[in-house]
Amino acid sequence: MANAKPFCLLGFFCLLLQLFSIFHIGNGELEMNYYKESCPKAEEIIRQQVETLYYKHGNTAVSWLRNLFHDCVVKSCDASLLLETARGVESEQKSKRSFGMRNFKYVKIIKDALEKECPSTVSCADIVALSARDGIVMLKGPKIEMIKTGRRDSRGSYLGDVETLIPNHNDSLSSVISTFNSIGIDVEATVALLGAHSVGRVHCVNLVHRLYPTIDPTLDPSYALYLKKRCPSPTPDPNAVLYSRNDRETPMVVDNMYYKNIMAHKGLLVIDDELATDPRTAPFVAKMAADNNYFHEQFSRGVRLLSETNPLTGDQGEIRKDCRYVN
């Protein structure tokens, strides 16, 4: 009888550990090296595929970065963006906000390589996050450490929310700051993330209002003439691939040239001019224009914050076998 109480306490303690374990599994969190036991080569496979695809199709690296934003800003980093219209799901890719997005077909190449190594293990949501990280490196941007994994995939899409949650090309700076703030991203990181425009482009349909019938006075005059050559019609075909790059000097490099351009009034969008002049953001713009290392530091921080937006973890969602369809 003397030992009954200690054994009872020990049994109770073990029960608590079991309950904690169950709770932890059902309510997991993102962590570093999540696949170290279940699929040790996962991150290396993704990196290799991103590199291979980049050398065959250079613009895939830009697509991976854009995918991260479009996926994570809409509700969750859960690969809902990758779902095609099928089995009662309406694809987010149908939204006007997704105009110009491409290279979704190459996600399947990455997923197939992972499925061959570790079937039904690595989520499409983690592919979105890690391919963005590795794509940034291919674009000569920062090598971002501390990208956590363990996301799970949604079982549906949020097409009805895309128009509300993805900023429009002509949204105000205040609106964009509010959007990022709502997912836990501060102003400094927001300014840095907008630096992704360094490798972006804007279709003429979204910028001609700054050129016709009169030129926006905030635009550098010589730059405005260049844009009119790129976009010669005030009413461009909305489906035509007519565009201008944000950065003419280093269009495929994630660097601080974007900030130098907007300080010289050579930004494509209204928000570019606001970013360089608004007292909330102008100091960050000036500092990033002057210091590429500082820009890379803040850009890395912004990407980490963005990639951890409201993920599905534990027993939420699923691990899709094909990123285009729910299981």
UniProtKB/Swiss-Prot annotation:
List keywords of the entry alphabetically.
Biological rhythms, Calcium, Disulfide bond, Glycoprotein, Heme, Hydrogen peroxide, Iron, Metal-binding, Oxidoreductase, Peroxidase, Signal
Q: In which tissues is it expressed?
A: Preferentially expressed in roots and leaves, slightly in stems.
Task: Relate the induction remark in this record.
Answer: Late induced after mechanical wounding. Enhanced expression following incompatible bacterial pathogen attack. Expressed under a diurnal rhythm (circadian clock control).
Q: What class of enzyme is it?
A: oxidoreductase
Q: Which CDD domains match?
A: secretory_peroxidase (cd00693)
> Is the keyword Iron assigned to this protein?
yes
Provide the cofactor note recorded for this chain's UniProt entry: Binds 1 heme b (iron(II)-protoporphyrin IX) group per subunit. Binds 2 calcium ions per subunit.
Any GO BP annotation: response to oxidative stress
Q: Where, by residue number, does heme b bind?
A: H197
Under the heading InterPro entries, the entry gives: Haem_peroxidase, Haem_peroxidase_sf, Peroxidase_pln, Secretory_peroxidase
Site annotation Transition state stabilizer: residues: R66
Taxonomically, the superkingdom here is Eukaryota
N-terminal signal peptide: 1-28
Catalytic activity, EC? 1.11.1.7
Q: Please indicate if the UniProt record lists Glycoprotein as a keyword.
A: yes
Query: What role does it play?
Result: Removal of H(2)O(2), oxidation of toxic reductants, biosynthesis and degradation of lignin, suberization, auxin catabolism, response to environmental stresses such as wounding, pathogen attack and oxidative stress. These functions might be dependent on each isozyme/isoform in each plant tissue.
Annotated family: Belongs to the peroxidase family. Classical plant (class III) peroxidase subfamily.
What's the protein name?
A: Peroxidase 21
Which organism was this protein described from?
Answer: Arabidopsis thaliana (Mouse-ear cress)
